[in-house]
Amino acid sequence: MNPQNIVTSLLVATDYIRAMRGGAQSHMLTANDGHAYVVKFANNPQSLRVLANEWLGCSIGRALGLTIPEPAILYVPATLVESSPSLVIQVSKSTLKCSYGLAFGSRFISEGQVLDYLPDSALSQVENVREFSGVFALDRWLCNCDGRQVVFCESERRRGFRAHFIDFGFCFNAGEWNFPDTALRGIYAHKVVYQNVGGWQSFEPWLSRIESFPLTTLWAIAGDVPPEWVERDTLFQLVERIDARRSRVRELIAAVRQSQRNPFGTWTEDKP
């Protein structure tokens, strides 16, 4: 395994930038490290557990070597909330101030042009297009109940774009923390990214890394989840279920291939 570093990063939010799109009603804030972060708050309309899901999903994915923005745990001071009139969320017909305290942040990618859409003609030329099969395996493992979300950034290595995988809030079925596995979830909307998946080897090295993922690493990642976000016993039960699912990822991928939503049109290999 050649994982990206897992870094426990507790930062302090210093400045408000702007609101972001999406069901969690995130906001972009600057932290005391000088970077901007897309921040989800404890009182987001989806679930408090979404913050833990983001930390777990991002950290596990980065440990697998996938291109995922660096996650952080941010402390949002009450003074920043009070001094930022736009730092609010809409719940039903009410407008509420975002909660202060510990929040989840995903480092904003600010280098070069950043897009949330590329046409099919450009997707196959994305520098790390093979990683779509790796994050697909990750999404099956963690039961991501949302469609795969991606942003594309200008590549520093060559002309073109690199995919950065974002939004793990609906892993473990969002706030439910169960695993309703179906073939309809976790697939990127533009199937051209899977056109070179011809067999199990196309999911390597990420599939083998999942199957051999150390339980000690899972515990270390989970240990950084703030107790304000989830009770310890409940979190530890989730970790045990995540670990138990490692051996089922091939089965879960095969179920998608056998479904009407099969995105792997060129896969001809039969055996696991």
Positions of predicted regions on the chain:
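Aromatic-acidic/polar surface patches that form glycan- and anion
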Residues: 50, 127-131, 231
